[in-house]
């Protein structure tokens, strides 16, 4: 029975996508809505059953559906593997996705492409479920590329907008960079392990760690190379510093898409992969150190950019980038359990933030927070939802973020990583930009046009009611994970799914009380600072002058996002364009001129010349015959004479 339920969890979103996608011209909005929401809700309920069976009772489900690849000794089956890690991911993905589907019925109600939109959302969910339930690297890669394709389709959903098309292409290309490294990592593993199955590869991890090769006079293990390549793939998918540039542009898609991408699907795939491959990464301390550094830098880097953004969705997008940095920092210090714990809690409160922001945008048709204000009385439910999501993000007790984020920072402190300081600084900035949104959108004097402000109201129930589930998740997921499942401990819920060779250090090291309370304390300080900065009109006008000042180089750097786009444009885009122009000129002026076009011109020229001999006069043709006879006789006479 449980095997059938497990299969249904994955196939129901696929069925929804196929029904709505293939019959998009024949199916009406109402029927499409019923199919999408009922199938996804059923999948979410089944995920609870599997969580009880596998997550709580520890019964692992391994289903071999059908043979896929068989070449000599290399064999890969199409399988479903569900352990504690997969079952908790099922909960996060299906429940957030079902809420997003229901919310979309109201948000996209006036859009002619709603059936196509629901189809893409369901397909996105299917690929993510396939990714987390794979038992081998090739099947994981299938899901990995699937979520990438769906993100392209959803970010560019409004394809008549040029900015949406450019954002979709940017996201697709940026992820291709990471995916290229990911493919090389998988190829390396298959080449040396002669298998793509997790079980076989993980057993060979110690051997791979001891297999050394010389690379530019530097001895490095095969495992280090494979893990580094896999992590670069994760950097692209999870928008870590360097490959993060696609994330803010992804806001061009409809807001429900942003919620699904940032909360439970695409960007969390990288964190999941590192956790799933903990059996490899634990034997590669060099790569773990690199992951810690990248995660720590990203969480502070993205939070600093979020401070200076004015677009409500982009602030939350950079918040996602920052929180993913926390998750990778946890994985880097071998606290994979804390990273996944934060992934799950983050899924609920980040989806709540995005969908609440969507309600605001739906009401006022504006995304610039400096043009809003005084909406708390017009939209009290949305205000309450956004406040709960923000406090959970900041890490205020007893909301979910308090337990999961503190777990990460305690692990970083216990491991002696300097990135702990980066995490604390990012926590302060998180509180400040969260309060920036709340104060400018819901408090103060309105800066909206009078007509827009007067007509601002709560969204319909189909948009508001589903958020109750996310509010509950933002409240209770942290408590359940901490008190009931012990997700913060390496020997807790995930002890059979994740490997931690240094678990004893985390178990015997107990950070002092002030370290445990420090994240919440700095969060409260950030809240106070944020309220002070964005409540006072005097301070606000000063901040606006600083942001617009041409002499304030620090704010210019933050507003321009550390000039990553400009840097890539200068180092990559422009040289490629110059090279393309050079090749284009060579193609047009040399290859085409002397190749196909030159040959065609020669034939045309010859045909024109021969055409001139066709005069239509008999005496001309007689002359040609006489000339031919004279030339022929002369030639033979010359041959005889010689």
Curated annotation (Swiss-Prot):
Gene3D superfamilies assigned to the protein according to its UniProt record, in alphabetical order: 1.20.5.2700
GO cellular component: plasma membrane
Entry protein name: NADH-quinone oxidoreductase subunit L
Enzyme class, broadest EC rank: translocase
Membrane topology: Multi-pass membrane protein
Superkingdom of origin organism: Bacteria
InterPro entries on file: NADHpl_OxRdtase_5_subgr (IPR018393), ND/Mrp_TM (IPR001750), NU5C-like (IPR003945), Proton_antipo_N (IPR001516)
Key word Cell membrane present: yes
Organism from which the protein derives: Rickettsia bellii (strain RML369-C)
Record-listed E.C. numbers: 7.1.1.-
Homology family: Belongs to the complex I subunit 5 family.
GO biological process, one term: ATP synthesis coupled electron transport
Function: NDH-1 shuttles electrons from NADH, via FMN and iron-sulfur (Fe-S) centers, to quinones in the respiratory chain. Couples the redox reaction to proton translocation (for every two electrons transferred, four hydrogen ions are translocated across the cytoplasmic membrane), and thus conserves the redox energy in a proton gradient.
Catalytic reaction equation(s): a quinone + NADH + 5 H(+)(in) = a quinol + NAD(+) + 4 H(+)(out)
Location of this chain's protein in the cell: Cell membrane
Taxon lineage: Bacteria, Pseudomonadati, Pseudomonadota, Alphaproteobacteria, Rickettsiales
TM region(s), chain numbering: 4-24, 31-51, 88-108, 114-134, 137-157, 171-191, 213-233, 255-275, 287-307, 315-335, 340-360, 383-403, 418-438, 467-487, 513-533, 622-642
Cysteines engaged in disulfide bonds, as pairs: none
């Amino acid at each position: 029975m449980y095997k059938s339920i497990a299969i249904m969890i994955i196939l129901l979103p696929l069925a929804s996508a196929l029904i709505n996608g293939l019959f998009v011209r024949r199916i009406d909005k109402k029927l499409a809505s019923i199919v999408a929401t009922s199938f996804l809700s059923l999948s979410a309920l089944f995920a609870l059953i599997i969580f009880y069976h596998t997550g709580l009772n520890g019964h692992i489900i391994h289903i071999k559906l059908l043979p896929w690849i068989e070449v000599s000794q290399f064999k890969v089956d199409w399988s479903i593997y569900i352990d504690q890690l997969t079952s908790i991911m099922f909960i996060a993905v299906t429940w957030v996705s079902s809420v997003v589907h229901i919310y979309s019925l109201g948000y996209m109600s006036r859009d002619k492409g709603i059936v196509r939109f629901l189809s893409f959302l369901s397909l996105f969910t299917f690929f993510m479920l396939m990714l987390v339930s794979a038992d081998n690297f090739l099947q994981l890669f299938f899901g990995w590329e699937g979520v990438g394709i769906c993100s392209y389709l959803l970010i560019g959903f409004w394809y008549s907008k040029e900015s949406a098309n450019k954002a979709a292409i940017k996201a697709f290309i940026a992820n291709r960079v990471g995916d290229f490294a990911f493919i090389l990592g998988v190829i390396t593993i298959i080449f040396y392990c002669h298998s793509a199955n997790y079980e076989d590869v993980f057993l060979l991890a110690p051997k791979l760690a001891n297999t050394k090769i010389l690379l530019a006079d530097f001895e490095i293990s095969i495992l280090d190379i494979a893990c580094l390549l896999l992590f670069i793939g994760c950097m692209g998918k999870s928008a870590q510093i360097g490959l993060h540039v696609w994330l803010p542009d992804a806001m061009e898609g409809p807001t429900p898409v942003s919620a699904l991408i940032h909360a439970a699907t695409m960007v969390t795939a990288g964190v999941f992969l590192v956790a799933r491959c903990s059996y490899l990464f634990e034997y590669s301390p060099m790569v773990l150190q690199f992951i810690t550094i990248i995660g720590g830098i990203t969480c502070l880097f993205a939070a600093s950019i979020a401070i200076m953004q004015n677009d409500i969705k982009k602030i939350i997008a950079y918040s996602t980038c920052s929180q993913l940095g926390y998750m990778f920092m946890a994985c880097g210090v071998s606290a994979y359990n804390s990273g996944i714990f934060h992934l799950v809690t983050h899924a609920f409160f980040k989806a709540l933030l995005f969908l609440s922001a969507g309600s605001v945008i739906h009401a006022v048709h504006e995304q610039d927070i400096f043009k809003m204000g005084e909406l708390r009385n017009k939209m009290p439910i949305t205000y309450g939802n956004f406040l709960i999501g923000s406090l959970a993000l900041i890490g205020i007790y007893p909301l979910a973020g308090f337990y999961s984020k503190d777990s990460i920072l305690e692990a970083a402190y216990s491991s002696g990583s300097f990135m702990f300081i980066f995490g604390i600084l990012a926590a302060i900035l998180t509180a400040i930009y969260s309060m920036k949104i709340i104060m400018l959108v819901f408090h103060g004097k309105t800066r909206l046009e009078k007509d827009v402000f007067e007509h601002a109201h709560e969204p319909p129930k189909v948009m508001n009611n589903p958020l109750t589930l996310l509010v509950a998740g933002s409240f209770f997921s942290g408590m359940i994970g901490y008190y009931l499942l012990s997700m913060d401990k390496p020997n807790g819920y995930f002890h059979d799914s994740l490997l931690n060779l240094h678990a004893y250090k985390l178990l015997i090291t107990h950070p002092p009380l002030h370290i445990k309370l420090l994240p919440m304390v700095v969060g409260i300080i950030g809240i106070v600072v944020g309220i002070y900065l964005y409540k006072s009109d005097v301070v606000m006008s000063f901040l606006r002058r600083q942001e617009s000042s041409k002499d304030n180089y620090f704010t210019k750097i933050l507003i321009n996002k550390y000039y990553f786009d400009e840097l890539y444009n200068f180092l990559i885009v422009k040289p490629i364009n110059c090279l393309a122009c050079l090749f284009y000129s060579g193609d047009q002026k040399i290859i085409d001129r002397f190749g196909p076009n030159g040959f065609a011109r020669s034939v045309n020229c010859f045909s024109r010349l021969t055409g001139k001999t066709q005069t239509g006069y008999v005496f001309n043709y007689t002359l040609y015959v006489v000339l031919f006879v004279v030339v022929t006789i002369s030639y033979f006479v010359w041959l005889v004479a010689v």
